[in-house]
Amino acid sequence: MLSRASVALFTTQLSKKPFAIEKPENSNQRRRQATQRNRIACTFRGGDEWLYNLRIMDNKQIARVLRETAQLLEIDGAIIGRYRSYEKAAELIDALPESIEQLVKEPEKLKELPGIGDRMVEHLQEIVKTGDYALRKKLLKKYPATILDLLQLQSLGPKKVAFLWSKFKAGTVADVEKLAKEGKLRELPGFGEKSEQNILKAVEVFKKSTGRFHINTAEDAAAAISVHIKKAGKAVESVTPAGSLRRGKETVGDLDLLVTLADGHTSQKDVDALAKHILEFPGIDQTLAHGENKVSFTLENGLQVDVRLLEKENFGAALLYFTGSKEHNVALRGRANDMGLTLNEYALATLKGEKRVAGRTEEEIYSKLKLDYIPPELRENTGEIAAAEHHKLPQLVTLKDMKGDLQMHSTASDGKNSIEEMAEAARELGHQYIAVTDHSKAVTVANGLDEKRMAAHIKKIHALSEKDLGIRVLAGAEVDILKDGSLDYSDEILAQLEVVVCSIHSYFNLDRAAMTERMLAAIENPYAQIIAHPTGRLLLRRDPIDYDMEKVLEACAKHGVAMECNSYPDRLDLKDVYLRMCKERGVKVVISTDSHNTGNLAFIRHGVTMARRGWLEKRDVINTLPVSEFLAALRPKPGVARTGGRQKKRAAKGD
């Protein structure tokens, strides 16, 4: 394990031609080779190493262009097959480990990918060359680009957006908000008064989210910019993210990067040359500032980046200051003052005479303040300073502690990879077991499995488990919690599942009392074992559902039901505050990815970060256990007891 001083430090090991395409024997080998070749070694929060694929950022940008094309085509009334072809291409490219920028140079190899034909190859070549292509440009002459913002409003789909454009020329969120406030939507076909109110709620969510970015978006940007900065050569000692990204906040407003200057490269001439190099990063949209030791700019997606150039002696103080939070820093400064010291971004020093006491590392600053080192995720002034003073900080869970992933989807429902492919990818990440949890029948939009299909699916998973896959594959399901709190499968099917994950995908707007009763009914079902994405939020898009969390957690503790910390960057659900409540109430937690393709499996690092923010330790998260102990920790089903992971019939009924 790496020292905490190196937490979140990005380092790179790239060859001169890191993206050259070799000739592997098969597609799996090609995927593995590309992943190894294109990854950047990074240090994960808490001292765990993880690998970040640099090219994913470029692929994501290309995927975004295709996805926007699909949305514009659907608004334009194109047939489903046409716009779905662009959606599928976007999904494929988003998850692809190889660089599309390189693959377009070998069109025949590119056409080996499913759904990529001659026309799509031409589109991709044009996008790589110019950043856009003719079809999207044509559509954006017909519709304003802001019309895509309307699809972020939870109550509006492409057909309604198209209708509002044709009738009112409503092409912005402000246009739709005005129509709703004037009561002009409720009389329209397919809308109504309730829909109008939901649109106004969605507008408020949109306004609150403006200027915020998902954690993986900020992480992608930090990695790519760090690689660029390191190319400056000997002048750069290290590049370290700070701010809310380092603290693991669920969304990020801006990005702070600290560049430590190497010995012998601290003159203003060296600093100016490095600043000039930084501002040559190809993704910059606008330069905001260029000072003596700081450059600021915005990226093409609107994310503001502040890069500060530091000498080694000040690195620890600067990292502490710019990591935050503001509340944590204020509390530390108050403590320093009480000890006759002063703390700022340059050093910890004496109040009298300003004699330097510490500043090179965060550890030495905390030590001089008579505190244990406080991990970045805990720095929110919610009791961590008192805990550090009394040596009672938790030993936070780490990525290396994780042994399994308990929510993922295969091609049986809405996943993009087979069970075997998901298992192989999970094994490569170091997992010992996974649960395949395809959707139940109520989620028709996700190709949910009816009881007959699920029974066959369970048998298929059991058959795979007999093979030597190098990883245990558990038969699970993501079972919908229906409006009345009942589960979407019969007891007969639920009894056959090894892992029963329950979640809400409908009726999000029930009142607090009704939603609480719905959740309690699901938890009281003797087959329920895990509640997935428990508040149903979609970050920057949809507010959480409203229920009495105290009552729900009390019921989970009583019945042995675990709460999920969903690692998907759009969700990160449960949030840190509720995870800490779980710990305090003895509620078990699982960290799962909700993966829909093999590339999503690495998202587990985000779930670990949220768990750390919630003060969770290894013992609080049951999928840190080996598979037999994990199965024993799950709520036992009616008539079944577990000993050492083996199921045994019980004489008594119930829990």
Predicted regions and their residues:
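Short, low-complexity, charge-dense intrinsically disordered segments
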Residues: 4, 9, 13-16, 29-36, ...
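Charged, compositionally biased N-terminal leader segments and the immediate start
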Residues: 56-78
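Active-site catalytic microenvironments in core metabolic enzymes, especially phosphate/sugar-handling
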Residues: 476-479, 606
